[in-house]
Amino acid sequence: MFTNQNTAENNPSIEDWAVISITDLDDARIKQGWYAVHRTKFCDVDMQHAEHEREMLMTAEQATEIVDYVYAVEPHISGLLVHCKGGVSRSAAVSKWVAEAFNLKFNHQYNLYNQHVYRQLAEAHERRKLREQ
């Protein structure tokens, strides 16, 4: 499930759900009580639209951390809440990757996801599969 930061901050915690919290600068105020929370920071820009050095794209390392986190919590949770500021593109990209990696439902007609974030996660997932061989 992907949503915006405001909704994630106001959502009551669910003890058998995990959270991926994506912000630009400051941490989101996620309530205590979730199974686990992974925090990461990167801007909502795609590689082709990154015009300034200060714009922080998602890195391969951040993608690997998210992939490894999802695999670590997956056996212990019944749901995953992914949020970013607007709840439109970064969180959607993560949710799309999770749905594909774990054969879960996702509206694949939804095309507003951040393509750079999605590519980074797909590549990190492939690297993980190679490490496990």
Regions found by a protein language model. Give the residues of each.
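Short, well-structured alpha-helical interface segments that form or flank functional binding sites
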Residues: 14, 61, 65, 89-93
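Cysteine-dependent PTP/DSP-like catalytic domain, specifically the C-terminal lobe
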Residues: 96, 102-133
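Catalytic cysteine-centered active loop of the rhodanese-like fold, especially the PTP/DSP P-loop
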Residues: 73-102
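Adenosine ribonucleotide-centric catalytic and binding domains
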Residues: 34-46, 106, 117-121
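Short catalytic/ligand-binding loop motif for oxyanion handling, primarily in non-cytosolic enzymes
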Residues: 28-29, 48, 88-93
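Helix-loop module immediately N-terminal to the HCX5R catalytic loop
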Residues: 38, 43-80
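Short glycine/proline-enriched coil/turn segments at helix->beta-strand junctions
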Residues: 14-16, 33-36, 75-78, 100-104
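Glycine-rich, flexible N-terminal cofactor/catalytic loop recognition
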Residues: 1-40
